[in-house]
Amino acid sequence: MEPRPTAPSSGAPGLAGVGETPSAAALAAARVELPGTAVPSVPEDAAPASRDGGGVRDEGPAAAGDGLGRPLGPTPSQSRFQVDLVSENAGRAAAAAAAAAAAAAAAGAGAGAKQTPADGEASGESEPAKGSEEAKGRFRVNFVDPAASSSAEDSLSDAAGVGVDGPNVSFQNGGDTVLSEGSSLHSGGGGGSGHHQHYYYDTHTNTYYLRTFGHNTMDAVPRIDHYRHTAAQLGEKLLRPSLAELHDELEKEPFEDGFANGEESTPTRDAVVTYTAESKGVVKFGWIKGVLVRCMLNIWGVMLFIRLSWIVGQAGIGLSVLVIMMATVVTTITGLSTSAIATNGFVRGGGAYYLISRSLGPEFGGAIGLIFAFANAVAVAMYVVGFAETVVELLKEHSILMIDEINDIRIIGAITVVILLGISVAGMEWEAKAQIVLLVILLLAIGDFVIGTFIPLESKKPKGFFGYKSEIFNENFGPDFREEETFFSVFAIFFPAATGILAGANISGDLADPQSAIPKGTLLAILITTLVYVGIAVSVGSCVVRDATGNVNDTIVTELTNCTSAACKLNFDFSSCESSPCSYGLMNNFQVMSMVSGFTPLISAGIFSATLSSALASLVSAPKIFQALCKDNIYPAFQMFAKGYGKNNEPLRGYILTFLIALGFILIAELNVIAPIISNFFLASYALINFSVFHASLAKSPGWRPAFKYYNMWISLLGAILCCIVMFVINWWAALLTYVIVLGLYIYVTYKKPDVNWGSSTQALTYLNALQHSIRLSGVEDHVKNFRPQCLVMTGAPNSRPALLHLVHDFTKNVGLMICGHVHMGPRRQAMKEMSIDQAKYQRWLIKNKMKAFYAPVHADDLREGAQYLMQAAGLGRMKPNTLVLGFKKDWLQADMRDVDMYINLFHDAFDIQYGVVVIRLKEGLDISHLQGQEELLSSQEKSPGTKDVVVSVEYSKKSDLDTSKPLSEKPITHKVEEEDGKTATQPLLKKESKGPIVPLNVADQKLLEASTQFQKKQGKNTIDVWWLFDDGGLTLLIPYLLTTKKKWKDCKIRVFIGGKINRIDHDRRAMATLLSKFRIDFSDIMVLGDINTKPKKENIIAFEEIIEPYRLHEDDKEQDIADKMKEDEPWRITDNELELYKTKTYRQIRLNELLKEHSSTANIIVMSLPVARKGAVSSALYMAWLEALSKDLPPILLVRGNHQSVLTFYS
């Protein structure tokens, strides 16, 4: 049966389209192995598998597929997996197969056509291309049907037929062949046994033939592409099926996106990986050319040729070797740490900056990255000036100076740095070739010196060179410090010669395999250069004496009896050097290596090579590091330098900047001051690399798993300490300056808070500390002195009730816990998706607005159930809420009384589990969620720039201040506008943007917006009135005290109001003053209210009765059965008996409101004891009416009731 025709695919070259159906000739002509998934061809009468691969749906003709057994309308999640990775070889093989198929079809070849010559090329039997994923060990799976081994004719005829167990087809996925029982892995060289048909396989729509683990399901097998970053260098990230795709219920109708019908492809299909390199021709270096050569050239600097002999003269052979080994210890430890970080995941460009920033975070990385890039830029000038000085010395010897010494250094240095810039800009390949040439010259110079030590000439003996002599070795083994030099000063001079170990790591982005190259190249370079330094130190110390005159007449003719020096024993008298300075010898001549060498010009070439190679390495490193720093946008002002050019993404702008910096310091030509600072910059980088390894190991993050195992966290810490010590040894003031610069940059980056998340060890250690302290805290018993208000605040979306949020934050900030509870109601599936999104969104909103709080969403059928979940489960260990904070239900008179009953039951639930309760009421209300979408309304009002301001009448159904389930806009409302003089003023306006029309709000919403921000500003000199009527353990008093400790509230005075009797007012005042003094709480006044129990005014009683009238049961006016039925159905109703029983308490609430208006109407805020209603005795309507009567028409009021356990104590 012929498959149905389908629309051609627009896939990438070399990748067969999803909708294409290969012909029989094409299938017979080639065995194309693609390292990805394949879709088997399915006859049209075979039913397609269900989306989850768990069965087969019989959908009849309507479910006919595209000829490949797939439904015509794949869902976006299906199309995501329809194309897999294709190597470059496979692409060429597919093209060859297609050409062969076309030729066979033109010749009239049938299904049994023989293999074409292209078959071998397309079979994938040739060796994979170097660097391809297949060559790197990418897994490949062949699915072979047993029938395929019989003959080509059987194979091809069965491909179109249906057997008992499905079509007998051969299909493959490359590489590891999966065989059915009785099949053979190896096919014969001829006939049909060598033919394997290639098909495309979609795990989402056809899993009938894939009876092997990992392929008979939508689940994806583990593969490297699922773990790539979206900006991966080797290919794009391939998405695995989401948990929702595997777990959610199937849709009744598949989503039709038109892709299978030849329409525009879906975005998910466009994002499928093509797994090619970034672009053709990208230059990548191995460990020798990329790391070893660079590190050796950078470590072997001018110091090797012109200072090492002087160091041996000063410190002697023994201490010189010790100096070298001390420097090697520091660099080796740093090399081990670098290797550990470099093998803990894929390393990109950026060198030391990348390693430190991804380990310690952007703060340290940003600081080090900037100074390290600058240090490399200035190092270019240092090395070029060293080269120029050597050239000027040669010119001076031959008396051919151009102007004078200083200007000649500038001219030669400028010309040199221009040439080096040209080599660098030409590309990394040219730069690498130049480094190889310079390394060869350097090695020849070292060899020239070694050969020269074995062929001493008579003419060189007066200059102190006698060849290898035990007398010279013994004399030079000990130190002879002169001119106030010490061991540490000599060490400070030598140590810069040991730096340069990061030369390879600095171009990590240009390495083929940084994880392997950096450890091998860096550590081997340290070993080789150390051996060379030690060898040359011992050689020169064994061949050359410390002092020599250079005078051939200083030979000794007769043997002296008092001869002690090595020169004297070798028949030379250089004793005159003790009284007058000499020009030769280790102590006096910096050109000892040139003198000793067999061919002096080669040493000069070695000096040129050492300086130019180091300059070239630094000229390449600085822009690469700076580009990586700019790409991360740590310093937004430098963003322009992130741009790369060409196939290698070369930082041309960075090259120009580095060139200008280097040229500036070359023209100064005085680097004696800046040199120690640069050395300290390098050492600071080394110290932080070592500290990064220690810190990452200390944090015990599961993500810290370096492939390089030869490191130790304590040795890394020792290395960091040694680096800091060496910084002070080299130059103490430069070390201090380095610390100041690093600290300043660290503070800047910390303040700016760059929007990056690299999973640093700082984050890991933060978690570990929090975990350890939480566990430790769980073993601490509660004590009254350590009580802290830990509030569960039913905010809903945090930005919907800013006044509630800020007020609670004012007394919990840096003192107690604050959790913003949000109850999601509605269909569970939708609510779960919203919660997943809201969790991250609102936590970010809290952090952005500097709210020290946690966001806790929960799904429930209703508000009460959600609050119960939160009260029982929110928090961790001892960090659990102990106080429930609610907004007052302002709309209770218009709301469904079942919602009111649910609201009141939150109080009872909180008291049941020993929570305190705080109710916050603002007369304007708390909920501004209905205003947060108003910006969208403005777009419809904008007609032209000349449109007049439009008054918006905001119509909405008033929602409860407690409704915690409404979806909200993330953007907060702003009503600040700029006046003509540029000052910012608060206006009752809502703006969309600066250029749009200004839309006034109505009066009610204007007041609501003003009230919502009242706790965000300084409260001024006013009072906090505390009505501590009932002893709840002290929470009613503790909250206002905590408010006064905050900056915004510090000018407010606490006034305390208590109930009492008229004949005991003075006594009660003194008793309360004594108690407050013992609690050490400052207060401005204490007022004793002796008339609390006075009957309230009649009009207020009438107003209260009008409020409760709709909610009364009036059982005396109804038959008993009807009344009982109503009470059962509507338990919130107020009975006559209940109203009479609690008349006194009702009057008290009304009376207290009158007293509050009398005494506290001007207070900033009122904190008052919350009346408690006995559960089962007081109806919800009556209790709600009490709260309404008590708190209406007042300044902001907090109704507080602790759990009646002491939270204050006067004991020490």
UniProtKB/Swiss-Prot annotation:
SS bonds (residue pairs): 563-568, 577-582
Membrane association type: Multi-pass membrane protein
InterPro entries linked: AA-permease/SLC12A_dom (IPR004841), AA_permease_N (IPR013612), NKCC1 (IPR002444), SLC12_C (IPR018491), SLC12A1/SLC12A2 (IPR002443), SLC12A_fam (IPR004842)
Consequence when changing residue 217 to A/S/E: Impairs transporter activity
Record GO biological process: ammonium transmembrane transport; cell volume homeostasis; cellular response to chemokine; cellular response to potassium ion; chloride ion homeostasis; chloride transmembrane transport; gamma-aminobutyric acid signaling pathway; hyperosmotic response
Source species of the chain: Homo sapiens (Human)
Impact reported for residue 289 to N: Impairs transporter activity. Impairs transporter activity and reduced sensitivity to NKCC inhibitor bumetanide
Catalyzed reaction equations: K(+)(out) + 2 chloride(out) + Na(+)(out) = K(+)(in) + 2 chloride(in) + Na(+)(in)
Record annotation: effect of changing residue 682 to C: Impairs transporter activity
GO-annotated molecular function: ammonium channel activity; chloride:monoatomic cation symporter activity; Hsp90 protein binding; metal ion transmembrane transporter activity; potassium ion transmembrane transporter activity; protein kinase binding; protein-folding chaperone binding; sodium:potassium:chloride symporter activity
Result when mutating residue 492 to E: Active at elevated intracellular chloride concentrations that are inhibitory to wild-type. Impairs transporter activity. Impairs transporter activity and reduced sensitivity to NKCC inhibitor bumetanide
Outcome recorded upon mutating residue 1201 to A: Impairs transporter activity
Segments traversing the membrane: 287-316, 317-336, 368-395, 406-429, 433-454, 487-504, 520-541, 599-623, 652-672, 673-691, 715-732, 733-745
Protein name, per record: Solute carrier family 12 member 2
Quaternary data: Homodimer; adopts a domain-swap conformation at the scissor helices connecting the transmembrane domain and C-terminal domain.
Function: Cation-chloride cotransporter which mediates the electroneutral transport of chloride, potassium and/or sodium ions across the membrane. Plays a vital role in the regulation of ionic balance and cell volume.
UniProt-annotated binding residues for K(+): 298-299, 383, 496-497, 499
Effect of residue 624 to A/C/D: Nearly abolished cation-chloride cotransporter activity
Compositionally biased residues, Basic and acidic residues: 127-137, 962-978
Bias (Low complexity): 150-160
Keyword Membrane assigned: yes
